[in-house]
Amino acid sequence: MRKQRLLNDIQKILTLNLSIAASFWGLNTQAFAHGGKAEMVSLYQNMSEQGAKVVKDDFTNTYMITKGSMVVRAKPNSDQVLINGKPFKLSVPLLVKDGKPVIGKDFFNEVFQSGLDQTFKIENTFHPLNSLNSDEIKKTFDAINHSKYAYKNMRFAELKLKEPEKAKVWDYFINHKEYTDARIASFILLKGNQAIEGEVNLNTQQVTKWNVLKNTHGMVLLDNFEAVQRVIETSKEYQEALRKRGITDVKKVIATPLTVGYFGGKDGLDKQLNILKVVAYLDVGDGNYWAHPIENLVAVVDLDKEKIIKIEEGAIIPVPMANRPYMSNKPVPNKLKPLTITEPEGKNFSITGQTIHWGNWCLHVALDSRVGLQLSTVTYKDKGVKRKVMYEGNLGGMVVPYGDPDIGWYFKSYLDSGEYGMGTLTSSILPGTDAPENAVLLDAVIADYKGQPQVIPNAIAVFERYAGPEYKHHEIFGNQDASEARRELVIRWISTVGNYDYMFDWVFAQNGVIGINAGATGIEAVKGVKSRTMHDSTAKEDTKYGTLIDHNIVGTTHQHIYNFRLDMDVDGENNSFMHMDPVVKANDKGGVRTSTMQIDSKVITNEQNAAEKFDPSTIRLLTNFNKENKLGNPVSYQLIPFAGGTHPVAKGANFSKDEWLFKRLNFMDKQIWVTQYNPDERYPEGKYSNRSTHDTGLGQFIGNNENIENKDLVVWMTTGTTHVARAEEWPIMPTEWVNTLIKPWNFFDNTPTLNLGEDEQNTQHDHH
């Protein structure tokens, strides 16, 4: 203790001396630079104005300043700073005056225009898949607003780039052919129980398509959140239901707008009405209203009339009132010593427009308002040749079905992307916690529900990481060691849908493997119950459909089922789907062995036979029989829907076959689907999934049972977890991951990481 006090006293003396020195040099907010006085300004204020973030590390007395891919570390009274780990000399040092850091007024220009950041390159030609920019979104809205179709209060479920012709995009990207087609904006408007699909030619700024779809329910939009809150706050009937539960201040009630599903009319709801159900929570001031559910009270809200048309009630359950904040309530949080990632020579990747180059990989990234992060024109440069791997890859759709039949739960089967728009709900990524400090954070522009551009800061993170040894071999007799470190490039996107936060990582390895990882975190949707412990007489019934994770709170058992749409083009567009099964066969060659291991292979020829459960013992390949490696093997990529995770795997939907959910969403029960490419088939749950009465997605896509042999194919991989709640996930849930892989299979001639170097060097100069 004495030693610690002594160290603390020494630290105070040093800090005082530094402050005195800084005050001397910072007199009248000026310091000397090149023999003259320099004007000094506040570090925090100036950097904030420039869009940079400042964090002080008290342990090392260092200021870390970040903007984009630039990381600057500066110590008080030193004219030497580190920019991305590389030394740089300032004309004026950072000083401390009256306990506050100050810098020369030219600090930002001096540091951030130092030329040490080579991450971003100028895009010489515009990639055809580049997202609509702010100006194009405004032009689209203006074209609609000035057309004969315009009406007041237009509400947009979607406004984005119409997919250009695939063959022309590949020609641009692979063959460097000029792309001259006009850019077209497509949009979806919602008007009552109608959806309006349209297009605008951005060259002519004319509406070229206007198609009204009747009896069609679209997504839940942001103004719906506001509308249901207004409705419950003005409903006397709802307030009376609250009073029965001891709640007198409706302003403390938080409404959540939930889609109602479809149950063949058995729920008594009119299919034609534009409605949502409202389940509410009580704000008790602890910052976590999710911990205070108002159980067994559901309001059915007519969105067009903005009124409650029905209140569904069950037995009164007291609202759990114990404070359960999920923000740290410690006065001083546990402080770990800094873990610093430096890249002293800059990034190993570069970004040209929306195209990322890393080693032999090249790919385009965008943010879609519905499905979020979208990768396209994914290629791998092998021996100087840019080889196609995937035209487009993204989350196709997902569903979160709950297994509780009670009044406030039976309808909960959220189609997060199809009903709420996960791209619209993108969560800005925080450096140092959501992604490493060395990550490059990219903003994205999408259209909001009013048809206006919305900038989402830090929407996508891109970073490189060490991922263990790529390979290792040591010769026992001799001094030879073969060892190579594995590097991965991670592209991360996060979406917050109500209580849950979903993280999606696309992970590229130098050896050609692509991982797609989905992580669930945030706060569990919980049910209020009477039981405090499992020893209570009510506990058995209260936990019939979940786990008691706190006093009076049950985490209800549910699933997170993800489907990824992968438009694979393995070394070209014409691919086939095949199985390879390792089998035991009798030894017919003689000798002491009675059995052998051999491989049975077969090609799956149609879409319906390709829809199947995942058996990890079967090797599933997307194969290009028109291309071979040097040994004569056809080139392939292996498809692995479940490659590990931290929650129990969802082998399929945990529902009986007579459930309406099964009739509407076939995709959730099988893990592999392969269809012929069709640009209009984009969502496994169907384009308009809200209140759908039957499967308008993958179940419909394979209805014509097209041939899939040597065709342009799309793979739909379903994966997910069955979430059985546990106390360690409350009040906030550690991120739980499920992993998928697509993996080269005889795609290369040998170990691809032995061929690094020349190809990677050439790739650095290829910014098309």
Tell where the protein language model's regions lie, with residue ranges.
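N-terminal, post-signal-peptide region of Sec/Tat-exported proteins
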Residues: 49-84, 148-185
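Exposed beta-strand-loop-beta-strand "reactive/processing" segments of non-cytosolic proteins
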Residues: 151-203, 249-303, 359, 491
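Short, non-transmembrane alpha-helical segments in secretory-pathway proteins
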Residues: 128-173, 221-265
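Extended intrinsically disordered, low-complexity coil regions enriched in Ser, Thr, Gly, Ala
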Residues: 53-60, 72-82, 115-122, 151-152, ...
